[in-house]
């Protein structure tokens, strides 16, 4: 990652919006403590899994010098698993309003360096998924042309089927999850020592 002309290796974690047993209404001092502990262990980057974070969280990331991947959706049009009451029910009606709200709220945070359109959405392997990814990426780029767009992909081991490759090509940064699932394709895409 290039930051102010310097190459920076991102060493990060995924953080959900809650603080475990403290729940979702997290006191700012709890986030400050958690972020300080992460910084002490060498962490400099955070992915906000899988929903937009609280503004106070991003304020702390700005102050403490973290790089943030700001993520919005955990589900698009296709539902995950057997759950029948997820965001997929509302996606077509609400995606644009929700996305614009997040971008407009978060785009002035210097800590936000990457936008993430989603987490392991089933849409990545269906023909219609590329069109959804295109709409999301275009909206991100229109509202904020300064940051790259990604999506957490977990179906890489499925191969370059008719749906996955066009889906991946719409992302500025292709994020790969679960390297251990890739089997013989692992070395094509990933190496701990590769820069």
Please place each PLM-identified region on the residue numbering.
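N-terminal carbohydrate-binding accessory modules
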Residues: 1-40, 59
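Substrate-binding/catalytic cleft of secreted carbohydrate-active enzymes
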Residues: 32-41, 45-195
């Amino acid at each position: 990652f290039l930051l102010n002309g310097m190459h920076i290796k991102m060493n990060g974690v995924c953080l959900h919006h809650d603080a475990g047993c403290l729940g979702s209404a997290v006191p700012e001092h709890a986030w400050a403590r958690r972020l300080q502990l992460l910084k002490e262990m060498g962490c400099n980057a955070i992915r906000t899994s899988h929903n937009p974070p609280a503004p106070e969280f991003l304020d702390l990331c700005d102050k403490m010098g973290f790089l943030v991947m700001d993520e919005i959706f955990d589900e698009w049009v296709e539902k995950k698993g057997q759950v029948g009451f997820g965001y997929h029910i509302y996606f077509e009606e609400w995606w644009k309003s929700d996305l614009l709200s997040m971008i407009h709220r978060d785009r002035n945070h210097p800590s936000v360096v990457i936008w993430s359109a989603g987490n392991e959405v089933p849409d990545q392997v269906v023909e219609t998924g590329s069109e959804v990814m295109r709409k999301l990426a275009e909206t991100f780029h229109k509202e904020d042309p300064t940051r790259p767009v990604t999506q957490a992909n977990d179906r890489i081991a499925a191969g370059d089927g008719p749906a996955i490759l066009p889906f991946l090509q719409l992302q500025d940064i292709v994020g790969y999850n679960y390297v251990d699932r890739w089997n013989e394709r692992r070395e094509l895409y990933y190496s701990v020592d590769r820069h």
